[in-house]
Swiss-Prot record:
This is 7-cyano-7-deazaguanine synthase. HAMAP family: QueC. It catalyses: 7-carboxy-7-deazaguanine + NH4(+) + ATP = 7-cyano-7-deazaguanine + ADP + phosphate + H2O + H(+). It is an enzyme of class 6 (ligase). Belongs to the QueC family. It comes from Escherichia coli (strain ATCC 8739 / DSM 1576 / NBRC 3972 / NCIMB 8545 / WDCM 00012 / Crooks). Binds 1 zinc ion per subunit.
Length: 231
């Protein structure tokens, strides 16, 4: 039996990954992390979606220690979430240092326990937002270290790594879940479900990608299929 663990936040990217994983694996587990995030509604959204989509199990892990160590606008009410700035350089204050290091490592430990061969994460380098822990080289390096440390080949899969946000919408549509991803996920840094606040970087990236996809579905769908190998 093929098993996978999806690092699941209930946002657009991880939900699209879950939708695909459910088609590719016999048994899919979801792991969501409570790290004291500013908008805890995402945990409830993740629970609802994991149940609705048919995950074998959904585990919420308490990693609130991260909140004590990692200062970010996503973990501190006193730090405002910035509006989207297209020309902004550097690492944004929405970056949570060490988050993906911790999440992927703990997801791999869980995968070991449930005998899953893969850990799936929705990180993406094409729409790079200044987060160093979303880079392909980081994921591969950590995957190598974790496999060595566990003496087990647990594969880190990044199905969205080389597709852009428009193509991510196309991937959701390919599996017949575009409306669900649009209306029932929570991607917004200000904690607003669906289309979100329209001001933060996450909402702008999501909206621009959707508009691009809806404006030229055949071209974007074809590009997504070419990059992912889907037919």
């Amino acid at each position: 039996m093929k098993r996978a663990v999806v690092v699941f936040s209930g946002g657009q990217d991880s939900t699209t990954c879950l939708v695909q994983a459910l088609q590719q694996y016999d048994e899919v587990h979801c792991v969501t992390f409570d790290y004291g995030q500013r908008h805890r509604a995402e945990i409830d959204v993740a629970r609802e979606l994991a149940l609705k989509l048919g995950a074998r199990a959904h585990k919420v892990l308490d990693v609130t220690l991260l909140n004590e160590l990692a200062v970010s606008s996503l973990t501190r009410d006193s730090i405002p979430v910035p509006d989207y700035e297209p020309e902004a350089d550097g690492i944004p204050n929405t970056f949570v240092p060490g988050r993906n290091i911790l999440f992927l490592t703990l997801a791999a430990i869980y995968a070991y326990q449930v005998k899953a061969e893969a850990v799936i994460t929705g990180v993406c380098e094409t729409d790079f937002s200044g987060y160093p822990d979303c880079r392909d080289e980081f994921v591969k390096a950590l995957n190598h270290a974790v496999s060595l440390g566990m003496a087990k080949d647990i594969r880190f899969e990044t199905p969205l790594m080389w597709i852009d946000k428009a193509e991510t919408w196309a991937l959701a549509d390919y599996y017949g879940k575009l409306d669900l991803v649009r209306n029932e996920t929570l991607t917004c840094y200000n904690g607003i479900k669906g289309d979100g606040c329209s001001h933060c970087a996450a909402c702008n990236l999501r909206a621009n990608g959707l508009n691009h996809y809806l404006a030229d579905k055949p071209t974007v769908m074809a590009a997504m299929k070419q990059k992912t190998g889907l037919r």
